């Protein structure tokens, strides 16, 4: 009997020692894996470019203000700059090597060759649909054209902010806007948007839901329209669907690595009156219109002052990421 008890005690003792050894071994293996993974993550994070949201210091005022024209001591070896310009600029300059010339001039301001990218667009519509804001800093040159002030101001509102959008099926559903940040954005070669506000019985308020000619017109033959209606009220919409698309969008906040330079025009377009623009400052400026060479020379001269008051953000997105995101 005593032999059986000793055997039982010995069995439990050996089992305890064996389990303890297994647990210690597992603990050592886990510690090794955790330290190894942590070490790899630290090394990779040091080698990669981390996001830098920066401080919100948007560009204010216009280029008519006397800025200091100086060359920075610090160059931008790790930054990229995208300069967007209309087709008419390259057409007027008519020089196959003009981009190389500008690259050499940017080099005198501390921007290495290969860090500045020149991107051409044909019109406001094309650029608003597919801006490709890929660089650390993105500067858009927009020629002021009489009669297109509304398209330009709405393009500014679109690309200076980030939007989260969903498609709208206006043939099946009524839609309402839930707050000041909620807008309907339509794009196309010719966008006419009409709305009919509805009461709680889904009857038209001042309009007939079955007759689009009685709807209120909120956008008429525009390339880009950001539509704002009364919040909390259902609306039936009528849109020229053959030449236009419309989406339900929410403004998420400022896109701080984008600035707009308005070329020409008596006054700078102001988008700060929109209560959804927060903070109430703007990243738009104006340069006097002369010739496109003169415009580019001015941009080169003041590029470092412009960039210093922008925020470099490595998550620059194109339209598929910020406009058509669902």
From Swiss-Prot:
Q: Name one Pfam family in it.
A: VP7
What the entry lists under Gene3D superfamilies is as follows: Glycoprotein VP7, domain 1, Rotavirus outer-layer protein VP7, domain 2
What modifications follow translation?
Answer: N-glycosylated.
Q: Which domain of life is it from?
A: Viruses
Q: Where is this region: GPR motif?
A: 253-255
Give the positions annotated as glycosylation sites. 69, 211
What start-end ranges are recorded for coiled-coil regions in this protein?
none
Q: Which GO terms describe its molecular function?
A: metal ion binding
Positions of region (LVD motif): 237-239
- What are the record keywords, sorted? Calcium, Capsid protein, Disulfide bond, Glycoprotein, Host endoplasmic reticulum, Host-virus interaction, Metal-binding, Outer capsid protein, Signal, T=13 icosahedral capsid protein, Virion
**Which residue ranges does the record annotate as region CNP motif?**
165-167
Spell out the subcellular localization from the entry: Virion; Host endoplasmic reticulum lumen
Instruction: Show which residues constitute the signal peptide.
Output: 1-50
- Where is it mainly found? virion
- The residues that the entry says bind Ca(2+) 1 are 95, 206, 214, 216
The cross-references to InterPro entries, in alphabetical order and at most eight, read:
VP7, VP7_1, VP7_2
CC annotations in GO = host cell endoplasmic reticulum lumen; T=13 icosahedral viral capsid; viral outer capsid
The disulfides recorded in the entry are 82-135, 165-249, 191-244, 196-207
Where Ca(2+) 2 binds, per the record, is at 177, 228-229, 231, 301
On subunit structure and binding partners, the annotation says: Homotrimer; disulfide-linked. 2 Ca(2+) ions bound at each subunit interface in the trimer hold the trimer together. Interacts with the intermediate capsid protein VP6. Interacts with the outer capsid protein VP5*.
Q: Briefly, what is this protein's role?
A: Calcium-binding protein that interacts with rotavirus cell receptors once the initial attachment by VP4 has been achieved. Rotavirus attachment and entry into the host cell probably involves multiple sequential contacts between the outer capsid proteins VP4 and VP7, and the cell receptors. Following entry into the host cell, low intracellular or intravesicular Ca(2+) concentration probably causes the calcium-stabilized VP7 trimers to dissociate from the virion. This step is probably necessary for the membrane-disrupting entry step and the release of VP4, which is locked onto the virion by VP7.
Q: Which HAMAP family match?
A: Rota_VP7, Rota_VP7_A
Family the entry assigns: Belongs to the rotavirus VP7 family.
Q: Further remark, if any? A: Some rotavirus strains are neuraminidase-sensitive and require sialic acid to attach to the cell surface. Some rotavirus strains are integrin-dependent. Some rotavirus strains depend on ganglioside for their entry into the host cell. Hsp70 also seems to be involved in the entry of some strains. In group A rotaviruses, VP7 defines the G serotype.
Protein name, per record: Outer capsid glycoprotein VP7
Native organism is: Rotavirus A (strain RVA/Pig/Russia/K/1987)
């Amino acid at each position: 009997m005593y032999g059986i008890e000793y055997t039982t005690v010995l069995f439990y003792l050996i089992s305890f020692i064996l389990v303890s050894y297994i647990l210690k071994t597992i603990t050592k293996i886990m510690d090794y894996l955790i330290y190894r993974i942590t070490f790899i993550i630290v090394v990779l994070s040091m080698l990669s470019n981390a996001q830098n949201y920066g401080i919100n210091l948007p560009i204010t005022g216009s280029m008519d203000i006397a800025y200091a024209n100086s060359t920075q001591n610090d160059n931008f070896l790790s930054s990229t700059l995208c300069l967007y310009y209309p087709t008419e600029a390259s057409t007027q300059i008519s020089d196959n090597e003009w981009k190389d010339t500008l690259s050499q001039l940017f080099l005198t301001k501390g921007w290495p060759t290969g860090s500045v990218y020149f991107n051409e667009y044909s019109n406001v519509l094309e650029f608003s649909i597919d801006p490709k804001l890929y660089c650390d800093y993105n500067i858009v040159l927009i020629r002021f054209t009489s009669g297109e002030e509304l398209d330009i101001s709405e393009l500014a509102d679109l690309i200076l902010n980030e939007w989260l959008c969903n498609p709208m099926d206006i043939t099946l559903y009524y839609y309402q806007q839930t707050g000041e940040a909620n807008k309907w954005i339509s794009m196309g070669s010719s966008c006419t948007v009409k709305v009919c506000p509805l009461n709680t019985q889904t009857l038209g308020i001042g309009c007939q839901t079955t007759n689009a000619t009685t709807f209120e017109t909120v956008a008429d033959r525009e390339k880009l329209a950001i539509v704002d209606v009364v919040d909390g009220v259902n609306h039936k919409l009528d849109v020229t669907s053959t030449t236009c698309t419309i989406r339900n969008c929410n403004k998420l906040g400022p896109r701080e690595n984008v600035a707009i330079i308005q070329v020409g025009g008596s006054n700078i377009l102001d988008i700060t009156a929109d209560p959804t623009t927060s903070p109430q400052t703007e990243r738009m400026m104006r340069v006097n219109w002369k010739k496109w060479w003169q415009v580019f020379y001015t941009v080169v001269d003041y590029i470092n002052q412009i960039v210093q008051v922008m925020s470099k953000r490595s998550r620059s997105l194109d339209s598929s990421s910020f406009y058509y995101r669902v």
